[in-house]
Amino acid sequence: MGKLNKSVQLAVFAGVAAAGAQAEPVTVVALGDSLTAGYGLPDGQGFVPQLQDWLDARGVDAQIVNAGVSGDTTAGGLARLDWALSGDVDAMIVALGGNDLLRGLPPAVSRANLDAILAEVAGTRGLPVLLIGLQAPGNYGPAYKEAFDGMYRDLAETYDAALEVSFLGPLVAGTDMATARARYMQGDGIHPNRDGVEVIVEAFGPRVAELVERAAP
């Protein structure tokens, strides 16, 4: 009888331990620039906190870590990748390239940096990734635009990453650029306002939920 009670106690303890392990949220690091960091917005209104609220409201057990740094290029993201991965990380959102565009950096340079990031995150560490791109403006010329826009598709395919082709794409869905800029952008015309971030999160939220599901044990 004593052995039976001990066995029951061990089984209960094991069950509690397993339940505790399952209760740990999936940690998703959002590696990006000012669009990720929430530039120009009060606390709680940027991309990461609004995304966290979206997931919480739908019962998605995840913690989104804001690893966005304003002004960061793909090279900057690569340089601090080890820091971003230093904790217990289960998945990553990679949203870099906007500042490469603003500086007119060669797409081949941006591509090499993103390739190195994804090689470490998805390749070496085997973590699921959501890659969020941007689209180059037409005034950079067709060759530049084709190379820049295409690198996100190519890299997502290479590393089996989920892909959203443009961080700002949801803002112009169903409307024109002038209307979207007036309604959803801050005065600088580069960064989304609170309402713009909300639109972006509504569009990307389901993809992040899928990412969490892929990362869950």
Set out the residue ranges of the language-model regions.
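Short histidine/acidic/glycine/proline-rich micro-motifs that form metal-
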Residues: 35-38, 42, 68-72, 99-102, ...
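N-terminal signal peptide c-region/cleavage motif recognized by signal peptidases
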Residues: 18-20
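Flexible, glycine- and charge-enriched loops at secondary-structure boundaries
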Residues: 6, 41-44, 70, 107, ...
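Alpha-helical cap/lid subdomain in secreted, periplasmic
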Residues: 60, 76-217
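Serine-esterase "nucleophile elbow" of acetyl-processing enzymes
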Residues: 22-70, 78-89
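Bacterial N-terminal signal peptides that target proteins for export
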Residues: 1-10
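Short gly/ser/thr-rich secondary-structure transition/capping motifs
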Residues: 11, 75-76
